[in-house]
Amino acid sequence: MAYTTAQLVTAYTNANLGKAPDAATTLTLDAYATQTQTGGLSDAAALTNTLKLVNSTTAVAIQTYQFFTGVAPSAAGLDFLVDSTTNTNDLNDAYYSKFAQENRFINFSINLATGAGAGATAFAAAYTGVSYAQTVATAYDKIIGNAVATAAGVDVAAAVAFLSRQANIDYLTAFVRANTPFTAAADIDLAVKAALIGTILNAATVSGIGGYATATAAMINDLSDGALSTDNAAGVNLFTAYPSSGVSGSTLSLTTGTDTLTGTANNDTFVAGEVAGAATLTVGDTLSGGAGTDVLNWVQAAAVTALPTGVTISGIETMNVTSGAAITLNTSSGVTGLTALNTNTSGAAQTVTAGAGQNLTATTAAQAANNVAVDGGANVTVASTGVTSGTTTVGANSAASGTVSVSVANSSTTTTGAIAVTGGTAVTVAQTAGNAVNTTLTQADVTVTGNSSTTAVTVTQTAAATAGATVAGRVNGAVTITDSAAASATTAGKIATVTLGSFGAATIDSSALTTVNLSGTGTSLGIGRGALTATPTANTLTLNVNGLTTTGAITDSEAAADDGFTTINIAGSTASSTIASLVAADATTLNISGDARVTITSHTAAALTGITVTNSVGATLGAELATGLVFTGGAGADSILLGATTKAIVMGAGDDTVTVSSATLGAGGSVNGGDGTDVLVANVNGSSFSADPAFGGFETLRVAGAAAQGSHNANGFTALQLGATAGATTFTNVAVNVGLTVLAAPTGTTTVTLANATGTSDVFNLTLSSSAALAAGTVALAGVETVNIAATDTNTTAHVDTLTLQATSAKSIVVTGNAGLNLTNTGNTAVTSFDASAVTGTGSAVTFVSANTTVGEVVTIRGGAGADSLTGSATANDTIIGGAGADTLVYTGGTDTFTGGTGADIFDINAIGTSTAFVTITDAAVGDKLDLVGISTNGAIADGAFGAAVTLGAAATLAQYLDAAAAGDGSGTSVAKWFQFGGDTYVVVDSSAGATFVSGADAVIKLTGLVTLTTSAFATEVLTLA
């Protein structure tokens, strides 16, 4: 008939319990209506699509209430939950607008299953003591149905394993802790299980697969006409009201006697529990499930040792076995129609064999030293927690016909027991280490042996780490992966893809291998290609790396010619990776691609003829390339080492770095930096690259390396850098505005000679850049009047660099940056301005001693934010300004003016001065110190309070005050006195015998302003102002 937009709006509004669609949803409904009118969409499809739009509201209420209370809400209940005038937090109100659909299912599930929730009591009774994996497995089968999902193309075992993986449990546990009031472990456990069920309900709703989704869709369709035909004030049983081909059937409980039980045509549940401690699944029992999708729950405290003699089970699709002790079970005979076997125990061993076509999930909590061994089955999942030395073995006697998934968690410091898997189409082994900080756990060695069906293997572990006060130590276990045909000379292998996430010493042996995915921490990896005598048809290996760091080599262990990989493709993604060594004897081509940096610290590949990099971030090759190898760079920042290459090397568009060990290249050789700001690193004794046409396209010249020293012509370069060197280094012909950056501690003096230093205002910029304290050595600059020094800390840990500067023409030194600087100012007698006021960071102390020798010269010295040490000249008149830190300002003579700045400063008086040439302190304040050790020439000034000031009449002169303060005999023990005169305060140290102030023997320090020193006290000749 074709729908109108108004009709679909009405249907939506009814299904949404009266809440009309918003503008965007209305546009969607208009599109559906138009499609029915043009023939692009059937009426049924348009209505179905319309009603799916209330999955995040109405469907949430229907499904969660059905699962946790046994009935869906009545019409009135749905009105209250979905769109109510009295419920201010219904599903269409602002409160839930921030919730995605899945989180709405989780929220409703937790609220119903815990605390005072309507289903809390029943949920606790059913799920307390049940593992997370078992919760997921049974809920998945109940909500979606294993058979239904399998028919729809879903890998049920993989889905269950994914939902019950430890990372998801950890996430949901953290979510529950953060978003609920629960603190007790039991409450949190139940809330996490409810959240898992909410996740499955959402998955069913999104996919539309399973009984819950089908019945819910039918109920919403019923609502869409404005009335609920099945309404019941007590709630609507979803499956009774909207029956499908498979609905909940009967619950049949076994007795301690011999039982013969037959299910209905619906989905029945058989319960084999205990009666007065006695098992109810006993000798001779016969269980027939009938036509539905049926479940047998076998629960007993005692060990399960086998199916009791004579027991016959048929037509039951799922068997859940829970024991308080060990489980030994074989369902490969005596059981027909079984598609899922789920076993669960705690603190005990499991030995389980599943029959053909049976998906097996074996869950063990607190496994400890107990062993788990499973055989047979289709898709097999083994999930163990609390493992110590217990081993895990899969397929030793009979391999799974489908996938194999093993997860093992160990929180102790006992080495995890070995894990061994044989067979399976795709094998996944995941280890999780949860030991405490400052302890070390060695993870399990993993052995995977393929069979003729095994094509892919994944092994992951928690990344290795060294134990410390805040770090848990982890050691990765060895990994051995062997194809079933590895030993065959005639049969080709099957394992084509291997994924390793953190690994110890690892080996892979398969002639079919084409792809290896690596991440995390790794020790070493050896890749073999089996014993196949024929040359492998695929000689290309793809290594996908993501955040990988290895301590050893990745080795193609096939040494025979033409037997190893000839092309290796390395792709970096997400996070940068470092491979300590790449060994590939047969490789002729290496391609490096991706969007995360790849570093290969060293490589051994004698046959290699070409390396091509297309990685957008760049690649670093730490070993020198063979002289006959062609390298082609990409758009990223690539870094390589060259000798006397005979090839034309083009670096590409990035900011590249090329290190050369020869100042001249081989015949026909050349290297071009390409676009970008490129660095040419001279690891040679002297160079003149600008004169050699073989070198081009480089903007920065860096001298660094074990052979780096000598004279280097800087002509043509716009920047200079210096690293660790073998000896003294000279940069010549340095152009104007070309600076030098020191990156590492050099050996010997570094001399910079300008191309033209005849001017009187030459400026040179010197940068010290490092993450830790840098000993920059001696830098000599000739003919430079201004030296700008930037001390740059490249991380957040404060440090102080050291530098000796020889710049005898310099008049001004300016220091900036976020690192401190201890500057040795050698021979720079012309400097009249030292300015470190732009240095930031309280840990960035600056040390400077003026070397100015001109009598009466005015010299200005400024400190920065750190605790600086600034020393004036003995001959010049210095103005020293400390800045923000707790500085030390040192007086060595002359008429000086000191300003400490903020912070508790130390004014170190190391020269006596005269009655007219002395130091003035402009901002002496409480907490500051006057260090007078250097001027008390006749014995220590006595400790204790300073006491009262010397006072004279109003007409007294400064000279009279000085005489009065020095009237005592200081020839035996120096005596300190103080007085105030002319609005300022003076401290006198009397070290002479006379009764007057003796200039040159006695000392005076002026404090600007009236500073009361009565309670200030001496300790070891240091006066602390109070």
UniProtKB/Swiss-Prot annotation:
GO terms for molecular function: calcium ion binding. Disulfide bonds: none annotated. Keywords: Calcium, Cell wall, S-layer, Secreted. Pfam families: HemolysinCabind (PF00353), RsaA_NTD (PF19198). It is found in: Secreted, Cell wall, S-layer. It comes from the Bacteria. One of its GO terms (cellular component) is S-layer. The keyword Calcium applies. InterPro entries: Hemolysn_Ca-bd (IPR001343), Serralysin-like_metalloprot_C (IPR011049). The S-layer is a paracrystalline mono-layered assembly of proteins which coats the surface of bacteria. Probably acts as a physical barrier to parasites and lytic enzymes. The calcium binding of this protein may mediate surface attachment by ionic bridging between the S-layer and a specific membrane-associated oligosaccharide. This is S-layer protein. It comes from Caulobacter vibrioides (strain ATCC 19089 / CIP 103742 / CB 15). The gene is rsaA.
